[in-house]
A protein has these predicted regions:
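N-terminal secretory signal peptides that target proteins for export/translocation
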Residues: 1-2
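A structural "domain/chain start" motif
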Residues: 5-8, 15-57, 170-178
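Soluble non-cytosolic domains of exported or imported proteins
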Residues: 45-54, 97, 101, 143, ...
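Short acidic low-complexity segments
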Residues: 64-75
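Surface-exposed short loop/turn segments
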Residues: 78-147
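C-terminal/domain-edge helix-coil "capping" segments
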Residues: 115, 134-178
Length: 178
């Protein structure tokens, strides 16, 4: 009985404070049919593919929107990779890197369903470890594998997209309030 009472008051507090999920707030701005694309950098096409995969997954899973062709889309989001950096964050006792932080900055050009263009820069980070040391031997392989690199950029791009959605949700909240 006490558990039900606590759950009831918890739900009442959340509803009473005006909480709305991001997908509801962005519904005002981002239409059901969304076209997404990532401008592929010729100097680093592998990063572009990882970002494009993370970007598309985030639109489908986080916004519950359908991907469509550019001609059928009501909302268009074009991502341009501004910067991808791997920063060493941890070293083993021999001085070799064993953890990195991937930092991804993406310049989003968004055409809203209202036709209004927006330019938003968002960043994302992803941490990963490289534990390849065996017992007390010095193992100098602190090289980032292609799979580690892809996964880190993929996760960082999803975090960047979350920042974009948060900024769009804030804009949607302001529009609804006015």
């Amino acid at each position: 009985m006490l558990k039900k009472l606590i759950i009831f008051f918890g739900v009442l507090m959340i509803l009473g404070c005006g909480y709305k999920p991001v997908s509801v707030l962005t519904k005002e701005i981002i239409a059901e049919k969304v076209y997404v694309d990532v401008v592929i950098k010729k100097s680093d096409p592998a990063n572009s593919v990882a970002i494009k995969d993370g970007f598309r997954e985030a639109v489908i899973k986080r916004l519950n929107r359908d991907l469509s062709s550019q001609s059928d889309a009501d909302t268009v989001i074009i991502a341009n990779i501004a910067n991808v950096v791997f920063v060493p964050t941890s070293f083993d006792r021999f001085g070799f890197v064993n953890a990195y932080e991937a930092q991804v900055s993406i310049d989003y050009k968004v055409k809203l369903s209202s036709g209004e263009p927006l330019n938003i820069i968002a960043t994302g980070k992803s941490y990963f470890r490289m534990n390849r040391q065996v017992l007390d031997t010095i193992y100098t392989d602190s090289v980032i594998t292609n799979q580690d690199r892809y996964n880190a950029i993929f996760e960082a791009s999803k975090e960047s997209f979350d920042e974009l959605i948060a900024k769009l949700a804030l804009k949607g909240y302001k529009l609804k309030k006015d």
